[in-house]
């Protein structure tokens, strides 16, 4: 039997909120089987819990935000959720003392390290995968995203930026998902932004915590970060990272092929909602033997059964 996973112990970190610029403390704790990922705002009294579900994503401007019926939000969840998806964490309680997850270095890598530090614990319940049975597609102008049947989880992603530095890089990546491939090839890709947009963003109280410490920054011609890029194709790989996180609000690891052109947070969430609404397009499956699982979630550092 392939089992569900949570973290072995509580771990905590601090960082800066990308949009607020304020200090944020984040804690990740073990959670029971079949509870999923639940985020908790501990800066409110009483604390407010928001389950990570597709219908709770109600804001997708510059990030993915969970918002409850009272308008209480937790923003910028996508990089943390990419790490949770990449390491196959099914159940966790995530506490944060601010309206947003800390941006850290702009990638998922610090969250991967945090989860690895906590340890990964297998739980006494079968892991459920969301298997795609037929294609589901959403479009917005020339942008589109699609999930279709595939034995495993494949990403086929293309961006199209006219900026000379991005245009010079590889803008199309096809990869078969595994935990090792995610950690090595995707998790370190940072968010990126343009100097020309910063004045507008800050006038709208966005990106107040943004800097070259947590983003790739470009002017009209080049990357301004002194150390350059982490990957030659870091731009498209960060968009893939975002998509991993955005898709994980489906509640389970997906078995299928995700194909996308110029998609972002809004379209990614539309795709998840469209998929879940069409119940003949998917089914939940579990596996008895590891050899039967078409996706490799090799546990970093070994797992503990509980």
Swiss-Prot record:
Q: In which pathway does it act?
A: Glycolipid biosynthesis; lipid IV(A) biosynthesis; lipid IV(A) from (3R)-3-hydroxytetradecanoyl-[acyl-carrier-protein] and UDP-N-acetyl-alpha-D-glucosamine: step 2/6
What Gene3D superfamilies is this protein classified in?
A: lpxc deacetylase, domain 1 (3.30.230.20), lpxc deacetylase, domain 2 (3.30.1700.10)
Origin organism lineage: Bacteria, Pseudomonadati, Pseudomonadota, Gammaproteobacteria, Alteromonadales
Q: What's the stated role of this polypeptide?
A: Catalyzes the hydrolysis of UDP-3-O-myristoyl-N-acetylglucosamine to form UDP-3-O-myristoylglucosamine and acetate, the committed step in lipid A biosynthesis.
Q: What is the protein name given in its UniProt record?
A: UDP-3-O-acyl-N-acetylglucosamine deacetylase
The record's SUPFAM superfamilies line, in alphabetical order, gives:
Ribosomal protein S5 domain 2-like
Q: Where is the active site?
A: 265
Q: Which gene encodes it?
A: lpxC
Task: Quote the record's binding site residues for Zn(2+).
Answer: 79, 238, 242
Report the Pfam families cross-referenced here.
LpxC
Give the matching InterPro entries: Ribosomal_Su5_D2-typ_SF, UDP-acyl_GlcNac_deAcase, UDP-acyl_GlcNac_deAcase_C, UDP-acyl_N-AcGlcN_deAcase_N
Q: Which organism is it from?
A: Shewanella baltica (strain OS155 / ATCC BAA-1091)
Q: Does the keyword Hydrolase apply?
A: yes
């Amino acid at each position: 039997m392939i089992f569900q996973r949570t973290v072995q112990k509580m771990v905590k970190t601090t960082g800066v909120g990308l949009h607020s610029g304020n200090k944020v403390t984040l804690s990740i704790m073990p959670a029971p089987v079949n509870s999923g990922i639940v985020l908790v705002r501990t800066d409110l009294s009483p604390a407010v819990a928001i389950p990570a579900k597709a219908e709770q994503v109600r804001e997708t401007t510059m990030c993915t935000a969970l918002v409850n019926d009272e308008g209480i939000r937790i923003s910028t969840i996508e990089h943390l959720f990419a790490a949770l998806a990449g390491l196959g964490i099914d159940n966790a309680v995530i506490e944060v003392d601010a309206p947003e997850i800390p941006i850290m270095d702009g990638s998922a890598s610090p969250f991967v390290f945090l989860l690895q530090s906590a340890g990964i614990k297998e739980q006494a319940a079968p892991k459920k995968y969301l298997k795609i049975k037929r294609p589901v597609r959403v479009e917005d102008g020339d942008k589109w995203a699609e999930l279709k049947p595939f034995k495993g989880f494949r990403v086929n992603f293309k961006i199209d930026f006219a900026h000379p530095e991005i245009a010079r890089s590889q803008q199309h990546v096809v990869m078969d998902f595994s935990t090792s491939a995610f950690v090595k090839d995707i998790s370190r890709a940072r968010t990126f932004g343009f100097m020309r947009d910063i004045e507008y963003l800050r006038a709208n109280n966005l990106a107040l915590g943004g800097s070259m410490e947590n983003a790739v920054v470009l002017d009209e011609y080049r990357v301004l970060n002194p150390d350059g890029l982490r990957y030659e194709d870091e731009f498209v790989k960060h968009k893939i990272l975002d998509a991993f996180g955005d898709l994980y609000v489906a509640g389970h690891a997906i078995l299928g092929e995700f194909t996308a052109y110029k998609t972002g947070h809004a379209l990614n969430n539309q795709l998840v909602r469209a998929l879940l609404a069409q119940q003949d397009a998917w089914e939940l499956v579990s596996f008895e033997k590891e050899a039967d699982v078409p996706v490799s979630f090799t546990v970093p550092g070994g797992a503990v059964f509980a």
